[in-house]
Amino acid sequence: MNNRKEDMEITSHYRHLLRELNEQRQHGVLCDACVVVEGKVFKAHKNVLLGSSRYFKTLYCQVQKTSDQATVTHLDIVTAQGFKAIIDFMYSAHLALTSRNVIEVMSAASFLQMTDIVQACHDFIKAALDISIKSDASDELSEFEIGTPASNSTEALISAVMAGRSISPWLARRTSPANSSGDSAIASCHEGGSSYGKEDQEPKADGPDDVSSQSLWPGDVGYGSLRIKEEQISPSHYGGSELPSSKDTAIQNSLSEQGSGDGWQPTGRRKNRKNKETVRHITQQVEEDSQAGSPVPSFLPTSGWPFSSRDSNVDLTVTEASSLDSRGERAELYAHIDEGLLGGETSYLGPPLTPEKEEALHQATAVANLRAALMSKNSLLSLKADVLGDDGSLLFEYLPKGAHSLSLNEFTVIRKKFKCPYCSFSAMHQCILKRHMRSHTGERPYPCEICGKKFTRREHMKRHTLVHSKDKKYVCKVCSRVFMSAASVGIKHGSRRHGVCADCAGRGVGTPLDHGGGGEGSPEALFAGEGPYLEDPDDPRGEAEEELVEDEDEDVAKWKDDVGLAHEDALLGDDKDDEDSPQGPHSPSGEPDKDFAWIS
């Protein structure tokens, strides 16, 4: 008993701790942070904010502690109603969502990088959309089953599905097939209360008549039971030719026979048609999931698919292309593969294949189809290596080796190299990522020296400084001194060149002023990039600025070559300037004229 140890967890302590912290927040006890949203002040504790939001964690951890006073944070992006629901969730673990505030709460949680709340709002919206889609789709399907002729079966189904999809604005925002399970409302429509759900599906028949009827469908003949997601590539890319009219007639007859029979049961496939000329993912469906009479979609013409031959004597050989082959050689290679799969001039209806050959045909067809999509002329994945940068060599490394089955994780092309550690943002250049990080930290590293206004980008600060120096932009091209009057740089005097001050025009090209380039009012000192204006080596705009400086240096050198003043003329010019100057001949030549003020 003396050596007994036990680690006990008391769950009631969590609720008690949150309750006490919430009471302290409501009474303003030990609150060391104030969040101002739309003029409303929300008192809170930094520890709670930091532990609940990655945005506050990044903001408060990088700010050095200067005093014990309360920290005031202004949030201009979120709304007061949305932030109130979020801060109540931080102190109580209860999220109050309604149909009125769910959008505001979701946007505020996304800005504060609280993924749990974003997912909860997403599920709330999805549940509301599923209810409306199911009700509308059920009405459409009931009308379709009762009073629609058999010849219009495909159009009626597509109109019913599109009617349900048009209700949901969130379904169009899906960008990744890996996340498609989050809001597959159309798939849930087939699985829910519809009349042709999975519980009503009939088992596949094993008779020879059923086999011959299945061979009429291009989705099951030669092409295999492949589920294609986001396919919008034209069938002409595969090099297939149109079938004879007699074969089209046979297909139409089979469609009418299937429509007038027991009816077909769709598999609940969902096609996200975003990019019309890319084939992103091709996955092989399990053989048992295919239906005996699945209809041909209206946007996939039966005459365009070349993988419709079921010749048992076809030789299936897939040659692995080298990564160093040219694009033309790859296209030629895949064209030969397609010709081998077509098997010459075989009939559309042929004898059934053995299970081994049929499986090999399905796998080889999937590989050839994917590669043909990659090498299509309009495919986004067929870009050259110079567009993709260092990731160009990764383009064909994700192709399946041999005749293996495909999956979503085997085919991915990474285009952006620099990723934000706090959110899902990614960029091609490091300077863009550094600029994006300032949105998380709130840092404004470029202040104006005159008024103190701070900016997140250096070019914005430079543009702002022109407001203070509108009438003070007369700069000598030789000594780079800045003058307030245009007359002081020789604009109104015909004896001097444009943009050259009186001292430099009288001095010639002998020796420029020592204090000219480093003066306080010179543009080099104003925009030299010293102190807080350090140049970003990764900024692509630096090259353009260097070209402007080089052009200016060429203008100065050209002016120096054209002047050609002799040493005696330079001395006479100095004496004349000394006599005209109100300071007298004994005044030092390095001091500026009193008539013109310097810009500090």
Swiss-Prot record:
Residues 197-207, 556-574, 591-600 have a biased composition (Basic and acidic residues). GO terms for cellular component: chromatin; nucleus. Keywords: Isopeptide bond, Metal-binding, Nucleus, Phosphoprotein, Repeat, Transcription, Transcription regulation, Ubl conjugation, Zinc, Zinc-finger. A zinc finger (C2H2-type) spans 418-436, 446-468. Residues 31-99 form the BTB domain. PROSITE patterns: BTB, ZINC_FINGER_C2H2_1, ZINC_FINGER_C2H2_2. Signal peptide: none annotated. One of its GO terms (molecular function) is DNA-binding transcription repressor activity, RNA polymerase II-specific. Residues 243-259 have a biased composition (Polar residues). The modification Phosphoserine is found at residue 234. There is a cross-link at residue 229 (Glycyl lysine isopeptide (Lys-Gly) (interchain with G-Cter in SUMO2)). Sumoylated. Desumoylation by DESI1 reverses transcriptional repression activity. GO terms for biological process: dendritic cell differentiation; granulocyte differentiation; macrophage differentiation; negative regulation of dendritic cell differentiation; negative regulation of granulocyte differentiation; negative regulation of leukocyte activation; negative regulation of macrophage differentiation; negative regulation of monocyte differentiation. The keyword Zinc-finger applies. It is found in: Nucleus. Pfam families: BTB (PF00651), zf-H2C2_2 (PF13465). InterPro entries: BTB/POZ_dom, SKP1/BTB/POZ_sf, Znf_C2H2_sf, Znf_C2H2_type, ZnFinger_BTB_dom_contain. The keyword Electron transport does not apply. Residues 173-222, 235-278, 513-600 are annotated as: Disordered. PANTHER family: AGAP004733-PA, ZINC FINGER AND BTB DOMAIN CONTAINING 46. Functions as a transcriptional repressor for PRDM1. This is Zinc finger and BTB domain-containing protein 46. It comes from Mus musculus (Mouse). The gene is Zbtb46.
